[in-house]
Amino acid sequence: MLGHRGCRLGISFPEIYEMQCTAIFHALVECKKLKIKSIIPEIMIPLVSTEAEIKIMKDLVIRVAKEVENKTKTKLNFLVGTMIELPRAAIKADDISRHAEFFSFGTNDLTQTTFGILSLIHI
């Protein structure tokens, strides 16, 4: 759970998230071509702990979406949010919410990081 993972990895190596978002948005374009209209992807940025992290990553997602929109001449609808899975994210949720269109709660990870235990350990 700790270290160079989640959104921090995406900030250091944006090409990873650019590739994933490009694939999501091209799949959405294909769905629209097939007249499947009810799909709105929810792109969840992992392991966010600060407002800056989600802002950087959301800006990346929006930039990639615009690139795909321009290339395919297709309007894309999507949401960007995060999972509250770190104690700091829970404490800073008000700030993080300025950039998140949805939240999910990672109760297993949140419990593990709050108590400093591994999931392999039985209490």
Where are each of the predicted segments found?
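Conserved alpha/beta-domain cores
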Residues: M1-I121
